[in-house]
Amino acid sequence: MAPVVPDPRRTKAFATAAAFEKWLAAHHARETELWLQIHKKASGRRTVTYAEALDVALCWGWIDGLKKSFDEESFLQRFTPRTAKSIWSQVNRDHVQRLVTAGRMTKHGQRQVTLAKADGRWAAAYAPIRSASAESIPEDLRAAIDSAHAH
């Protein structure tokens, strides 16, 4: 598989979530992707944060994708419109429920939710991947690990 190279013509930075939302309001229906440049906190430069950008994208029926390093102060996060095959994560379902309650969803974002509920993708949302907790480790394995650490 060839490496993904962001298109500079589709790369933008926004100082605020409101600026990103304004761009999506004007471009959500005709653009196929956006590589959003997000500056790291330590850079001292204010850009929309990943969490803010994800909320805005979900409200407009878009979704995050690949993340690529850009320079020492920032990274690029790819956003695209959801498709009929876009899978949902439980995390994004939770975000959407919060955004609906806050009255932030647009009709475009809500349409994606409605379609996902109708075709089963909403109910099939995958759970977040978490590291194993102590409770999920079999007792015999835990005893062996504890024994090994004791010696």
Residue ranges and their predicted role:
Residues 1-151:
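Charge-dense, helix-prone N-terminal extensions
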